[in-house]
């Protein structure tokens, strides 16, 4: 499985049967590596008490780091223990999994990537990249914007200081929401679904503060395109939108434009409907986007499927435990690919050594 974060950073996921590794190429020599940030990003995927078999464990740095900084060689992160072995023969297709597509493309006996282990390795890489960005003054955070009828309070899209404070307040929360009452409602909703052997989908909203203007490219490798491409590679993602996103369909151009203002020697905008990016380039405002995750397909209820050998319809019941809130665990992976994509765009300015240049654009 290959992840191309941009023009320079690439990563490959390799499953050897005895372990899983993520190899990342393109990191500059001398970039500080915060091991605590890496482990913290993975730990935030928990707790795993209700489903210990899905606990991916803690990744380790195998190579590419010496003395707390990158060497310029590929960074290798590893997890002990392999994924489930490839099944012998064809099994009934699981509804809304990619079993049917894998069978149509490669036939039987394909090893299915473990979503939790994939997420853990991406979260680990993201923890390293995110800490490096923080050293440049770039801060990011993610909250649960919606699950069912439960909605969190909206983020202050233009007030950088207030937004930074709210993002900081999300750290360490099992249910990262700014509205404490909403968090309790969500907790009750998750408990109800868990007791019924069901799963829930949700929307994660990510904000990045203090990005310089002009980061990205005005083409298919722009900041929105690069982020969307990598976010859609995460298990369960079904939608990505920036700023107003699909809400732009309800607006006229005169309502949808972010009008420019001059403040204290820098250029900003009165609003942030575009979500901090226009035409593939950042505009200096906070970068804000939402990622929608479908409910995990494995549920206690009996589902209808088709036996690939006999082509007969049959009933299928998935074995538990069931991942009721898979979207909550995905926060680290979302921030992981976000940090990797943004780091790649920064490296375009000065790719050979750390720190990479901030450019001439001033962030608000």
Regions found by a protein language model. Give the residues of each.
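Generic N-terminal targeting/processing segments that precede catalytic cores or assembly contacts
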Residues: 1-364
């Amino acid at each position: 499985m290959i992840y191309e974060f941009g023009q320079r950073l690439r990563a490959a996921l390799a499953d050897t049967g005895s372990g899983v590794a993520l190899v990342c190429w393109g990191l500059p020599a001398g970039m500080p590596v915060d091991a605590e940030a890496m482990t913290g990003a993975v730990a935030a995927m928990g707790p795993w008490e209700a489903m210990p078999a899905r606990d991916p464990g803690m990744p380790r740095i195998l190579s590419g780091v010496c003395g707390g900084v990158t060497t310029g060689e590929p960074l290798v992160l590893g997890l002990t223990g392999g994924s489930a072995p490839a099944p012998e023969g064809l099994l009934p297709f699981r509804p809304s999994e990619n079993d049917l597509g894998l069978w149509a493309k490669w036939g039987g006996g394909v090893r299915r990537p473990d979503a939790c282990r994939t997420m853990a390795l991406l979260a680990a890489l993201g923890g390293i990249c995110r800490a490096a960005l923080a050293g440049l003054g770039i801060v990011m955070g993610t909250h649960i914007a919606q699950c069912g009828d439960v909605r969190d309070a909206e983020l202050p899209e233009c007030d950088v200081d207030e937004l930074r404070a709210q993002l900081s307040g999300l750290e360490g929360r099992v249910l990262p929401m700014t509205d404490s009452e909403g968090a309790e409602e969500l907790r009750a909703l998750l408990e109800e679904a868990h007791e019924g052997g069901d799963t829930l989908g949700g929307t994660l909203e990510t904000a990045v503060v203090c990005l310089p203007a002009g980061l990205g490219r005005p083409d298919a490798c722009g900041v929105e395109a690069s982020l969307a491409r990598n976010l859609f590679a995460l298990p369960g993602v079904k939608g990505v939108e920036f700023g107003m996103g699909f809400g732009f369909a309800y607006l006229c151009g005169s309502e949808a434009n972010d009008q420019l203002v001059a403040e204290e020697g820098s250029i900003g905008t009165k609003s942030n409907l575009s979500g901090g990016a226009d035409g593939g380039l950042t505009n200096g405002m906070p970068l804000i986007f939402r990622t929608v995750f479908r409910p995990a397909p494995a549920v206690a209820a009996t589902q209808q499927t088709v036996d690939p050998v006999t082509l007969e319809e049959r009933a299928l019941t998935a074995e538990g435990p069931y991942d009721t809130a898979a979207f909550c665990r995905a926060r680290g992976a979302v921030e992981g690919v976000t940090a990797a994509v943004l780091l790649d765009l920064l490296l375009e300015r000065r790719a050979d050594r750390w720190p990479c240049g901030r450019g001439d654009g001033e962030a608000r």
